[in-house]
Regions:
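Structural signature of tandem alpha-helical TPR/SEL1-like repeats
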Residues: 2-6, 11-30, 51-64, 86-98, ...
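Structural marker of alpha-solenoid helical repeat scaffolds
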Residues: 34, 68, 101-102
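TPR alpha-solenoid repeat register
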Residues: 41, 75, 108-109
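Canonical tetratricopeptide repeat
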Residues: 44, 78, 111-115
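TPR/TPR-like alpha-solenoid repeats
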Residues: 48, 82, 115-123
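TPR/TPR-like (Sel1-like) alpha-helical repeat modules
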Residues: 81-108, 114
């Protein structure tokens, strides 16, 4: 059990930013063992999974971050970007709609919508080719 989750998160983020990804991952997991729904640890670990080539695994952590705190626009941006990365058009569209429902509807989300549409169009073209 962690005595100071904030200090542990700060340490994990420092390792992450320094490029020490394995240490950062271990620190995020330590936080998540103590508090499985910690939104920032889930978000950052989800991003780390994606960076390490496991974006599909990262999605589950990004979802937990959003479920815990849907008001953070960055969480929505991260999951939509990751879903686009793994070419999951349907879930990216669903996430975008949910983000809009909770009030996230600025220019970044318009660009994400355009990226989803571009991916949908390219998938349709490749399926008909």
């Amino acid at each position: 059990m962690l005595d100071n989750v904030d200090a542990a998160l700060e340490s994990a983020i420092s390792s992450h930013e320094a490029g020490d990804l394995l240490v950062a991952g271990e620190k995020y997991l330590e936080i998540l063992k103590s508090d499985p729904s910690h939104p920032d640890a889930n978000h950052n670990f989800g991003l780390l999974c994606s960076k390490l080539g496991e974006p599909a695994m990262g999605v589950q952590f990004l979802r937990t971050a959003i479920e815990t705190n849907p008001t953070v626009a960055g969480f929505w941006i991260s999951i939509i970007d990751t879903l686009i990365e793994i070419k999951d058009v349907e879930n990216a569209k669903i996430a975008l709609e949910k983000a809009k429902e909770v009030g996230h509807d600025d220019e970044v989300f318009e660009k994400l919508a355009a990226n989803i549409e571009l991916l949908r169009s390219s998938k349709t073209e490749s399926e008909t080719a």
